[in-house]
Regions:
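Conserved, mostly hydrophobic/aromatic
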Residues: 71, 105, 131
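Short, surface-exposed basic-aromatic patches at helix termini and helix-loop junctions that form
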Residues: 132-137, 155-159
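Catalytic beta/alpha-barrel core
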Residues: 80-82, 91, 112-120, 137-150, ...
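Active-site mouth loops of central-metabolism enzymes
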Residues: 38-66, 90-93, 117-121, 143-144, ...
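Catalytic domains of carbohydrate-active enzymes, especially glycoside hydrolases
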Residues: 59-84
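Active-site-adjacent beta->alpha loops and helix N-cap segments on the catalytic face
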Residues: 88-101, 120-128, 145-157, 170
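N-terminal amphipathic alpha-helix/helix-capping segment at the start of soluble metabolic enzymes
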Residues: 1-58, 66
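Glycine-rich, proline-tolerant flexible connector loops at the mouths of alpha/beta enzymes
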Residues: 50-52, 75-104, 109, 115-121
Length: 170
């Protein structure tokens, strides 16, 4: 294995991820001493969330900000907000509402935030671009950008000091 990941500062600069020069958890190959960040995943629309999993959160998953706060209390290093409500075939929530929610989570938890879309590539790019433009007091991790669709979103992310996760089917 001869690849490596770059180090990136997330949040307000006080969290650093990456920098590995070997496979995860192989300390004899990987001289990077940063431990992996543990993420707590939050959905903004739990309509399709598994019922059995909802039970674990004691009703706190009904409010995404409260759910993110719970993850912080449990020791999560980063919050991953999955914007399921923006799906055009379901709730079709606005990009502004999504950006407001991300900002509320950032403000309430003071943790780095990874933002994921609903899986509809066109809608994800539209909404995540607005999120990049409106959330400015932290460095977001935008998840994920596919090869043929990255230019607009990458431009918005870079212009606002956010980072993106590239995705490539092998």
């Amino acid at each position: 294995y001869n690849g490596e990941t770059i180090q990136v500062a997330l949040g307000k600069g006080d969290y650093v991820a990456g920098g590995a020069k070997g496979m995860p958890f192989l300390s004899f190959e990987n001289l990077n001493k940063l431990r992996p960040m543990i993420a707590g995943e939050v959905w903004d629309d739990i309509t399709d969330y598994p019922e059995i999993a909802k039970e674990m959160f004691s009703g706190r998953c009904d409010d995404p900000v409260e759910w993110a706060t719970m993850w912080k209390e449990l020791g999560a290093d980063i919050i991953c907000i999955r914007l399921m409500s923006i799906d055009p075939f379901k709730k079709n929530a606005s990009a502004d509402d999504a950006a407001t929610l991300v900002q509320r989570i950032v403000d309430k938890t003071n943790l780095p935030v990874m933002v994921s879309g609903c899986g509809n590539v066109e809608r994800d790019i539209e909404v995540l671009t607005v999120v990049c433009e409106k959330v400015k007091n932290t460095r977001l991790l935008i998840n994920k950008v596919e090869e043929g669709e990255y230019k607009k979103l990458a431009t918005a992310a870079m212009a606002n000091n956010h980072v993106i996760i590239g995705f490539s089917n092998l």
